[in-house]
């Protein structure tokens, strides 16, 4: 099985080199530091949980390497509004927007459009391998960034977290196994995403989250990611003590993503 993650990271480095020729780091950093205040990503999650509800980070995702195109009529602003409204009772706490172009058919403009259409905090979902992308994330309007432990060494994670927090962004650090979790716990961020999908072979099991939960200190907030498709999945994870969920694929195939979200978390 070819290592998908290595391929993605190689492409990311090429993209960054090209981007820096168009917009040097100094310019992107200036744009990032000039942005107005961020929306409170962590606060939005904790508010839902404190009220006894599941905190849902709803994903705006056109395609994936494993499933191909998920949604042909892909209008990020409409999708974001649908998530924000839900069914009037249950709705998204935050958004996650894919900005990777080559593998997920995402884009920076999609994040801007989604954020402009609602009041929800927005996570930039991409494969960050360079500080340039952290500044770029804030410059495009992201309120939070994803740092994937499998893509970064300890020094990079610490450095990129410091940059993100200095810009007012929340950091969701993503892990898949116990070794990655131990590394993630060295960071300051309380937001720990457990990806139920192994990024090296794209196999999925929600057991990944259940296995790691007991290792999480009480001051950290677990966010389960990937493979959450049924109400049974949600019930199993909630029974295990999970309160925050990042879900995309299950909603992207629905006519009204917000209604699909509400139905899954009833």
UniProtKB/Swiss-Prot annotation:
It catalyses: 1-(2-carboxyphenylamino)-1-deoxy-D-ribulose 5-phosphate + H(+) = (1S,2R)-1-C-(indol-3-yl)glycerol 3-phosphate + CO2 + H2O. This is Indole-3-glycerol phosphate synthase. Pathway: Amino-acid biosynthesis; L-tryptophan biosynthesis; L-tryptophan from chorismate: step 4/5. NCBIfam families: PRK00278.1-6, PRK00278.2-4. Disulfide bonds: none annotated. Gene3D superfamilies: Aldolase class I. It comes from the Bacteria. The gene is trpC. It is an enzyme of class 4 (lyase). InterPro entries: Aldolase_TIM, Indole-3-glycerol_P_synth, Indole-3-glycerol_P_synth_dom, Indole-3-GlycerolPSynthase_CS, RibuloseP-bd_barrel. GO terms for molecular function: indole-3-glycerol-phosphate synthase activity; phosphoribosylanthranilate isomerase activity. The keyword Cell membrane does not apply.
